[in-house]
UniProtKB/Swiss-Prot annotation:
<dbReference type="InterPro" id="IPR004731">
    <property type="entry name" value="Transaldolase_3B/F6P_aldolase"/>
</dbReference>
<keyword id="KW-0963">Cytoplasm</keyword>
<dbReference type="Pfam" id="PF00923">
    <property type="entry name" value="TAL_FSA"/>
</dbReference>
<keyword id="KW-0808">Transferase</keyword>
<dbReference type="InterPro" id="IPR033919">
    <property type="entry name" value="TSA/FSA_arc/bac"/>
</dbReference>
<protein>
    <recommendedName>
        <fullName>Probable transaldolase</fullName>
        <ecNumber>2.2.1.2</ecNumber>
    </recommendedName>
</protein>
<dbReference type="GO" id="GO:0005975">
    <property type="term" value="P:carbohydrate metabolic process"/>
</dbReference>
<dbReference type="GO" id="GO:0005737">
    <property type="term" value="C:cytoplasm"/>
</dbReference>
<dbReference type="InterPro" id="IPR013785">
    <property type="entry name" value="Aldolase_TIM"/>
</dbReference>
<dbReference type="InterPro" id="IPR022999">
    <property type="entry name" value="Transaldolase_3B"/>
</dbReference>
<dbReference type="InterPro" id="IPR001585">
    <property type="entry name" value="TAL/FSA"/>
</dbReference>
<comment type="pathway">
    <text>Carbohydrate degradation; pentose phosphate pathway; D-glyceraldehyde 3-phosphate and beta-D-fructose 6-phosphate from D-ribose 5-phosphate and D-xylulose 5-phosphate (non-oxidative stage): step 2/3.</text>
</comment>
<dbReference type="GO" id="GO:0006098">
    <property type="term" value="P:pentose-phosphate shunt"/>
</dbReference>
<keyword id="KW-0704">Schiff base</keyword>
<dbReference type="GO" id="GO:0004801">
    <property type="term" value="F:transaldolase activity"/>
</dbReference>
<keyword id="KW-0570">Pentose shunt</keyword>
<feature type="active site" description="Schiff-base intermediate with substrate">
    <location>
        <position position="83"/>
    </location>
</feature>
Length: 217
């Protein structure tokens, strides 16, 4: 499974990339707006920080404008993935951009039918939103499982990019169900390494080592 970090904060991206914890980045207009910086400049800077895919979302609502924005974003760097909403217009734009060998991430997927349409439109990634489904009392993991079955049944190349990840448990469940990618905030990705028994074991090791009075260096 690949890990993408869901943020537009370049300092956080650089830290995680240096540690080798991320394979790519996802952004959206809301995340970039919080930075107060120029949209295109932020996307370009992120693309320079990581070698993997960087999802940058269009803001237009009609297919022709989405396509134009997507082409402009794709010119920023080779690793740009154009993020499109899962609407009728978004699917038309996806098909057009895919035909020009531009990678796409069709986002805001909340049903297996939507995901199937995105795959048929040639999406590189489809992003089912787990946490937001859970908020409605719907099991988001059922969507991951259904998409995995459908994509395998018909040999779609579209990758399942699990989004709206809220916890380490979400990532574990997505991994067990066969999601190709999980994108999560920096805090969730960093939290994957934490376990109380690891901390307790390290504390005991260090206490024993201190008693020896030795130093490796």
């Amino acid at each position: 499974m690949k890990f993408f970090v869901d943020t537009a904060e370049t300092a956080e991206i650089a830290e995680l990339a240096e540690a080798g914890l991320v394979d790519g980045v996802t952004t959206n207009p809301s995340l970039i707006a919080k930075s107060g910086r120029n949209f295109l400049e932020v996307v370009k800077e992120i693309c320079d920080l990581v070698e993997g895919p960087v999802s940058a979302e269009v803001t237009a609502l009609e297919a022709p404008a989405m396509i134009a924005e997507g082409k402009k974003l794709a010119l920023l760097a080779d690793n740009v993935v154009v993020k499109l909403p899962l609407t009728f217009e978004g699917l038309k734009a996806c098909q057009a951009l895919t035909a020009e060998n531009i990678q796409t991430n069709v986002t805001l997927c909340f049903s297996a039918n939507q995901g199937l349409l995105a795959a048929k439109a040639g999406a590189t990634y489809v992003s089912p939103f787990i946490g937001r489904l859970d908020d409605l009392g719907v099991d988001g993991m059922e969507l991951i499982a259904n998409l995995r079955m459908i994509f395998d049944n018909y040999a779609f190349d579209t990758q399942i990019l699990a989004a709206s990840i809220r916890s380490a448990d979400h990532i574990q469940q997505c991994a067990l169900l066969g999601a190709d990618v999980a994108t999560a905030p920096p805090s969730v990705l960093k939290g994957l390494v934490k376990h109380q028994l690891t901390d307790k074991g390290l504390e005991a090791f260090m206490a024993d080592w201190q008693k020896t009075g030795q130093s490796i260096l």
